């Protein structure tokens, strides 16, 4: 309704129509001018005439590009294609191929070229001077706008074959520029190494000496005679480099790091050479590229002889502090070493060089030849063969490889170890979900390679049965919980949020069983082959071999049973949730309005569809969280799609008439819901599976969504052709119950033909069967557990270290550190009591504690009682693979203490003694503050450090697994503590476990100062063991170095601590009064 002036509508006149058409045409022309404004602005300065330098474009025909194709199609000059400023070269190639009647799908075999040449007069051919190939994504018209050919030359775009262009480019090799750059590189190398380089003219006449590729005259064979040119001084000429090898000492590379950067010979013809790694701030004269080489690693200088007035003298090597240098496989340390002919220099972990002095003119000494034979053929860092490592990139070689992954245990600890691994990981935690499979594979590997033949077969059976029992118990608990739900089943009773925690352990062990099954299938034949060879050697019977083979086959069958059973149980319970929420997709009212927020860019899913999608998404998230193999996860989703599609189709065909689903509005609504569901499946990566298992339902809904006017015109034959996925019985069911109008029945044209009549009236063929689900196929690749992998997940490695620590605890319980065996009769060396530190301040002026302590005076001396060292029964004697316990010899008598390490004030108490009221009991609070009466009860420093204290820890230090992965009641509980230094430091008194009654290596807490950060944390207690400091493991560190690492760890520090039981804490704390 209009308010105000009333308008009278009348048909327009011819003049008005003409005027409107003119306005419309002018508007369209302005619109087009905006589109090509950028393109036309290029030629605006050229006037109305065409540019003679541009042969492929014309101002009079903007947007038209001439592509010349003489080399592609003989007899054709050019073809015109439409182009804009944003057209890419790839698109123009396709358009040009269509214009030349060639297949556009072969566009990869052609390229568009920007050719600059000279267009002759009439009748003369085009002469190309140079050309450039356009990249596929380049914009030819934009490049044409940015640069122009110089005056007198023209430019045109040509279509050429890629093979012709590559052949032409291969013929034109720029030898002049390459020679200049090669000479520049030679000059740069000669300046870096201090060696003369021949002139450019001489280099062309004679090839340069190939020092980087051949041993040349510096081979290991003896030098028989010096050349005549070396007998007198001579100006450097073309052979100066070759002669300098006879005149000057040099280093011959035997083992290097990088074939690309290392030189074979380093000539020492200066008074001073610096050796190191080249950095922006350091440019040594001898550059080495290994990562463990310091920017300034060492210095080699010429030292004049004291009794000789000649300038020539001997060469000495001066190491830099912190550099790893060995001469003849002996550590240099901080001392200066005189180099002799035939010495072997080891720089870092990679470089091995032979020092040769031609002035001595003698064969290599016999000791040098013996050392050469003893050169290790493997890398001292990673153990890899040096020949195989040569092709490795510096980045890969710079990363230290993880040590060999082993899990050693004794046969009597097998059951306890398996039980600990089975309960190590909580399925709902944050740890790596395949940790049990990895650890169990390590157990199988150790049993097969170290135990008696046939033992690992029983271990396989034991593992498989444990997993089966665990899965059975979890599914039994889930079934009992589901049975307690109230009937009838509702949406609230079968929510996925309540179902996920119960499905986690089942899927968790299904995932680990898949990895274990593949490992057994791959490794068991190798173990059996090795076992067969051992049985042949020992002459055993075949019964043991057959029993082991039978046990392994039975174990694989049990694991397959676990996988299939867990798969079935998970599908059953998820399908139970789908059974409740799927029918709502068909029962929703037609054309209901969807709520959508004003800021929402896309409509939200309707509630009934959102519930279905949430079930799929929860199942998918659960499979990915528990790291189920992707193929198995896809098969489980496919099974859920099969169930959903079959259920919806059967409900539609069975209950469709009663739900009023067989008419057009409901068909359109249900079809839209299905399309939204399929769109989600495509976004989740399961589009193909969704379309396959929902094909019949989609076909049914498309029929119901067909407009009535179109549907009544279709015959039975046409409907069969339009909806081929439906069987005759299903199509007949839909057509006979389709609701055209209130008084109209089915059309006569919908009657089935004579050929389909028998099948159309079979009522048993209407509903789909659930008996043909997609098959469950175990995967054959894509597994994650690999014991030989170079890179291992940190979480798995942490739990491996934890299990090693757990085994160490079992061994220490079985054989506690006690004095020597009675009746041995052998005299044992005495062991002084270990040093005791309270970490107070990390910023001390005193240097770090040396391994050879100084005598601070008699006031700081105490003598510990003599006791024997534990031998076979000691836990530290059972070292893990690849590590031997080593300890410096202890000396009897009063030990010396370094004054720089006396961090404990004289009034610091050492904590309660066993039996005192304040001694912590089992389960009591950790880190309880000491009573006031004990603060000044003791004075003086107890304990001392023996000389040469370099004890190596004999067991692995386990980083902490997640808090949900380990029971707090276990004495091997590992946790992380972050402490910040206070005014008095950290407030922890530390002691070496080897100097206590525990008799095991390690850094243990012996005291906690009241009110200190360590006591205030509340988790630390006496007897706890420090495993890591700021991520640095204390494995292999001596006591003094470990304490020094803590002292200089910064203001905020992070400790990895292993909780000890009360018995261990008593052994750590108990001290005998000094004699």
UniProtKB/Swiss-Prot annotation:
GO CC entries: microtubule; protein-containing complex
GO molecular function: GTPase binding
One Pfam family named in its UniProt record: RA
Modified residues (Phosphoserine): 206, 216, 219, 221, 393, 890
SMART domains per record: DIL (SM01132), PDZ (SM00228), RA (SM00314)
Keywords: Cell adhesion, Developmental protein, Phosphoprotein
InterPro entries: CBD_Rasip1/Radil, Dilute_dom, FHA_dom, PDZ, PDZ_sf, RA_dom, SMAD_FHA_dom_sf, Ubiquitin-like_domsf
Protein name: Ras-associating and dilute domain-containing protein
SUPFAM superfamilies (UniProt xref): PDZ domain-like, SMAD/FHA domain, Ubiquitin-like
Domain PDZ: 976-1061
Residue ranges occupied by any Dilute domain in the UniProt entry: 497-764
Family membership noted in the UniProt record: Belongs to the RADIL family.
Domain FHA stretches: 314-389
Domain Ras-associating: 61-164
Subunit comment: Interacts with RAP1A; in a GTP-dependent manner. Does not interact with members of the Ras family. Interacts (via PDZ domain) with KIF14; is recruited to the microtubule network restricting its interaction with activated RAP1A.
Stated role: Downstream effector of Rap required for cell adhesion and migration of neural crest precursors during development.
Region (Disordered): 183-237, 872-967
Superkingdom classification of source: Eukaryota
Organism: Homo sapiens (Human)
Annotated GO biological process: neural crest cell migration; signal transduction; substrate adhesion-dependent cell spreading
Positions with biased composition (Low complexity): 225-234, 950-967
